[in-house]
Amino acid sequence: MIIVTDSERKIRLPFSRGILTRSITLAGIDVGIAYAIATEVQKELEWKGKKSVTTEEIRELTYQKLLEKGLREEAKRYLFWRELRRRKVRLTVLLGGATGVGKSTIATELAFRLGIRSIIGTDTIREVMRKIIAKELLPDIHVSSFLAERVVKAPKNSDPLIYGFETQVKHVSVGIKAVLERARREGLNTLIEGIHVVPGFVEPREDEFMYVIAVPKKDYLIAHFYERARYSQRDAEKYVKHVDRIMRIQDYLVERAREHGIPVIENVELESTVSTILADMMKKLEEMGV
């Protein structure tokens, strides 16, 4: 067994290919390739007869392995993210987007790579609110976001679908802001995802990262609904029935994002989506001088 010593955190842990793989994927490298590199690092340490190494030695050896494979840009990104983690820079990521665009899957993958332990879905926040606030007081939070217009009276000359959706977002965003305030106050790494993460209703600070996830056409949404139904108790037909309404909400979210300067990320393939977000985060962190 190889023991890795982290002098800054004053801890000693067994070498883990899984942990190293996660660090390497932050550089935008496919998980399979990252795992192969982590395995090479482990084998070289074993060949050298190493029983104890430092995190600095692991970092340098991994960096060299990336260079040997011609992955110069990836090697640079690897060092960047490792340094960021060493300095304990707080990371807060907010992912918005219409129902079924893949926010939860993207959030899980991002959190794994960034080492963020806290993922909070806005549907969970809404569910808590439903338990403590009666339907008679806030009827909109007791229905699906794309059906809120049925319980909210929209003003004349307004789009009832969007007005109902905005009403629900306005109420749920109170809970989102509370989660954000706690993360800021306590310096916690946090990832918040959900349809209620809407630009303008939730305002990220300069050192926080917000993205709106979208799909190119409704066929992608329909496929997502059926795929999701295979692994959960959600009825795909309920969502397919209202897919046009959901796409209208997506159009609204994309427009809001552009108005507020929030990046819109088209989700066609998971690895590409996650890599795009990580690259954008790295660029912004570098611009901030982090």
UniProtKB/Swiss-Prot annotation:
Pathway: Thermoadapter biosynthesis; cyclic 2,3-diphosphoglycerate biosynthesis; cyclic 2,3-diphosphoglycerate from 2-phospho-D-glycerate: step 1/2. It catalyses: (2R)-2-phosphoglycerate + ATP = (2R)-2,3-bisphosphoglycerate + ADP + H(+). Gene3D superfamilies: P-loop containing nucleotide triphosphate hydrolases. Residues 1-89 form the ATP-cone domain. The keyword ATP-binding applies. It comes from the Archaea. Its EC number is 2.7.2.16. Its cofactor is a divalent metal cation. Coiled coil: none annotated. One of its GO terms (molecular function) is ATP binding. The keyword Nucleotide-binding applies. Keywords: ATP-binding, Kinase, Nucleotide-binding, Transferase. InterPro entries: 2PKG, ATP-cone_dom, P-loop_NTPase. Belongs to the 2-phosphoglycerate kinase family. Catalyzes the phosphorylation of 2-phosphoglycerate to 2,3-diphosphoglycerate. Involved in the biosynthesis of cyclic 2,3-bisphosphoglycerate, a thermoprotectant. This is 2-phosphoglycerate kinase. It comes from Thermococcus kodakarensis (strain ATCC BAA-918 / JCM 12380 / KOD1) (Pyrococcus kodakaraensis (strain KOD1)). The gene is pgk2.
